[in-house]
Design a protein with these regions (language model features):
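Structural motif of enzymes handling amino- and sulfur-group chemistry
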Residues: 181-203, 233
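A short helix-loop-beta submotif of the ANL/AMP-binding
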Residues: 44-50
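Conserved glycine-rich beta-strand-loop-beta hairpin in the small C-terminal domain of fold type I
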Residues: 190, 206-215, 226-235
Length: 235
């Protein structure tokens, strides 16, 4: 339990993590496009967001070379969301390994937002960057929650996994802010985990059906193009 914290949603995990690790002026690399709150959370924690433009030819995924180019002596962390909101793309094991190598070499923390981990289609596999070896695991703050997988957005339940010293800092900050998720929410989360199986499979099936239907309609509009969504529920 020294490496786990439970809180009021993945958003809370991200915010508390940034408040824990950042000193004023520290930089955080954020690939673009990104979830709207990333940059604002960094600013609220006293940090400086460094937004990296990505290329549609690479499905808007940041490369190791782009990450290297964004690193300065003030870089503290990189925020990595895969599966990606808002593009629906998925980083491969090879792409993640390349980013992990850069992070470890530069001793940069990776804040891995994996909230859409179950929403992966067409036989693709979601790989967690923290699973790629002990070195990158020790440099990763993994964030997840119940809002997407279990359709529990309003319940506000999330968690983070990280080295014990980071989690200890997060617990101190959380103790003076939200304290903890409500007891009712925690019991609901236990039930969700225990009954995951077919319920989650059905949720994924429904979203996959919607995804295919949307793509079929978009394919009929010659003036529009899109990046093929391997994951999430965005195009």
């Amino acid at each position: 339990m020294d490496e786990i914290i439970v809180n009021s949603g993945a958003k809370s995990s991200l915010s508390v993590a940034l408040q824990t690790i950042l000193n004023p002026g520290d930089e955080v690399i954020i690939p673009k496009p990104y979830w709207v709150s990333y940059t604002e959370m960094v600013k609220l924690a006293g940090g400086v967001p460094v937004v990296v433009d990505t290329d549609p030819e690479n499905a808007f995924k940041m490369t190791a070379e782009q990450m290297k180019a964004a690193i300065t002596d003030k870089t503290k962390a990189m925020m990595l969301n895969t599966p990606v909101n808002p593009t629906g793309v998925l980083y491969s094991r090879e792409e993640l390994q390349a980013l992990a190598d850069v992070a470890v070499a530069a001793d940069i923390l990776v804040i891995a937002d994996e909230i859409y981990e179950e929403f992966v289609y067409d036989g693709n596999k979601m790989v967690s960057i923290a699973s790629l070896g002990e070195a990158i695991k020790n440099n990763t703050i993994l964030v997840n929650g119940f809002s997407k997988t279990y359709a529990m957005t309003g319940w506000r339940l999330g968690y983070a996994a990280a080295p014990a010293d980071i989690i200890a800092g997060m617990k101190r900050i959380q103790g003076h802010t939200i304290s903890h998720p409500s007891t009712i929410t925690q019991y609901a989360g236990i039930t969700a985990l225990e009954e995951k199986g077919e319920v989650v499979n059905e949720i994924i099936r429904i979203f996959d059906e919607r995804r295919r239907g949307m793509m079929a309609r978009l394919d009929k509009i010659s003036q529009l193009s899109y990046i093929y969504p391997q994951s999430t529920f965005y195009i």
